[in-house]
From Swiss-Prot:
GO CC annotation: cytosol; plasma membrane
Gene Ontology BP, a term: UDP-N-acetylglucosamine biosynthetic process
Name this polypeptide is given: Phosphomannomutase
Organism encoding this protein: Salmonella muenchen
Phylogenetic lineage: Bacteria, Pseudomonadati, Pseudomonadota, Gammaproteobacteria, Enterobacterales
Domain of life: Bacteria
Length: 478
């Protein structure tokens, strides 16, 4: 006799929560029953708002992802819904196919979070689910049977259409004389990227492919990855290095010297190349984006793509070409746009390829570093402390809200005072030398993130390392 489960009970006991982008938690908590529960609840909410008979499904390269996808597919089958399984592809490739076919989608991915975790990201037929959708999903009360896991057959249509989305914009192979390194690691799009850049004319050099999952965080690039990029650029005479996080929605791009570009600088350059009228960006992005008169309007939001997407509704009422981007490199196209007189449809989800392609298109007759040098000299940096609970992070933030002097002492900046504070997302302060320090708990993992902005890259890096070092010491982690 099969066990019958209640969705509301299962999720409340699971330890899985919605984070900045999707439901995230420990792999051990993503049991087949929990995956099925989320799937049934998502399906229930979508059926209340849309008409469809199919759900699209894909995964990243985490070892746990395939079994989770099997559980999702089994739950859909029980409810009479067909599953189209696209295998290992980038999240934006799945989103693009989902929106094109007007069907919901589920991406099994933990993105950049630690190896022992994973996640589920959900898409409506018109794009990412909203925070209201998330709330509805966790409150669905429905019954379902214990899922029976079966093998899944892969369709390659989504990968092909994602490549075509970008290659169709360029009648000529504009990367013909460029050498592009692809830092493959375990990225979901590593094979797809090689194909695409070759089709655009580039000589592609494959770098550091890994058979084991590597959780690359584009917002906290390791010293090892920084050193490797510099070595690769020189050794292989590269014009650029392209990589992504695990599920291919956040880009990581280095110039011809192997210097990784900050995600918000990449997003700015892409938006300028697209001639965007207005942009939505999280509060953690470089302040010069707002002050530099690059756009008719800049809307600042909380951190996370759902908040950027929510801002698109406001912007679209007044502006024709709108985009959004984040400090982690995620780029979201909020409106249709023409490139080379060819239509590129909106894709309101994080996409690693568009900013990379537009940067390379903008630098086809020059170097990437030349483009960057034209921007105002204001620099950002970020890093994190792992295994820090939300409770601990919030205690530190609350200290800043209640006693600024003690807070500055705690983080090692007691010789300064605060000129301005912002609590849009966490605690962001401007101190008396115009440097910016920003602390917030990660929405996806038990981590404390620190962002800094200064007039030199060295100063920005030193601020972050000083803050995190002091916090580690105070917490007994030194």
């Amino acid at each position: 006799m099969k066990n019958i489960y209640n969705t509301y009970d299962v999720i409340n006991k699971s330890g899985i929560n919605f984070g900045t982008s999707g439901a995230r938690g420990l792999v051990t908590d993503f049991t087949p029953e929990v995956c099925a529960r989320f799937t049934i609840s998502f399906l229930t909410v979508m059926q209340q708002r849309f008409s469809f008979t199919t759900v699209a499904l894909a995964i990243d390269n985490r070892p746990s992802s395939y079994a989770m996808a099997q559980a999702c597919a089994a739950a859909l089958q029980e409810k009479g819904i067909k599953t189209v399984y696209y295998g290992v592809i980038p999240t934006p490739a799945l989103a693009h196919q989902s929106i094109s076919d007007k069907v919901p989608a589920i991406m099994v991915t933990g993105s950049h979070i630690p190896f022992d975790r994973n996640g589920l990201k959900f898409y409506r037929p018109d794009g990412e689910i909203t925070k209201d959708d998330e709330n509805a999903i966790i409150h669905v009360d429905a019954s379902f049977m214990q899922p029976k896991l079966e093998q899944l057959t892969i369709s390659t249509i989504a990968a092909r259409n994602y490549i075509l989305r970008y290659t169709s914009l360029f009648p000529m192979p504009f990367l013909k004389n460029k050498r592009i390194g692809i830092y493959e690691h375990s990225s979901a799009g590593r094979d797809l990227y090689k194909t695409l850049f070759k089709m655009l004319g580039a000589t592609v050099v494959s770098l550091a492919r890994s058979d084991e999952f590597v959780p690359i965080d584009t917002e906290a690039v390791s010293e090892d990855d920084r050193n490797k990029a510099i070595t690769w650029a020189k050794k292989y005479q590269l014009d650029a290095i392209f990589s992504t996080d695990g599920d291919g929605d956040r880009p990581l791009i280095a110039d011809e010297y192997g210097n990784w570009l900050r995600g918000d600088i990449l997003g700015l350059l892409c938006s300028l190349e697209l001639a965007a009228d207005a942009v939505a960006i999280p509060v953690s992005c470089n302040s010069t984006i707002s002050s530099g008169n690059f756009f008719k309007h800049v809307e600042r939001t909380k951190i996370g793509s759902p908040y950027v997407i929510a801002a698109f509704a406001k912007l679209s009422a007044n502006y024709n070409c709108i985009a959004g981007f984040e400090a982690n490199g995620g780029f979201l196209l909020g409106s249709d746009v023409y490139i080379n007189q060819r239509l590129l449809k909106a894709l309101p989800t994080r996409d690693a390829l568009l900013p990379a392609i537009m940067l390379l298109f903008g630098s086809k007759d020059k170097s990437i570093s030349e483009l960057v040098k034209k921007l105002p000299a204001r620099y950002t940096y970020s890093n994190r402390l792992q295994d820090i609970s939300v409770k601990t992070s919030m205690s530190l933030i609350n200290l800043g809200l209640t006693d600024q002097e003690d807070f500055l002492q705690y983080i090692g900046f007691n010789k300064h005072h605060i000129l301005h504070s912002d609590v849009t997302d966490g605690f962001r302060i401007t101190i008396d030398n115009n440097n910016i320090i920003h602390l917030r708990p990660s929405g996806n993992a038990p981590e404390l993130r620190c962002y800094a902005e200064a007039d030199s890259q060295e100063d920005a890096c030193n601020i972050v390392e000083t803050v995190l070092s002091n916090i580690k010491s105070k917490l007994g982690r030194a």
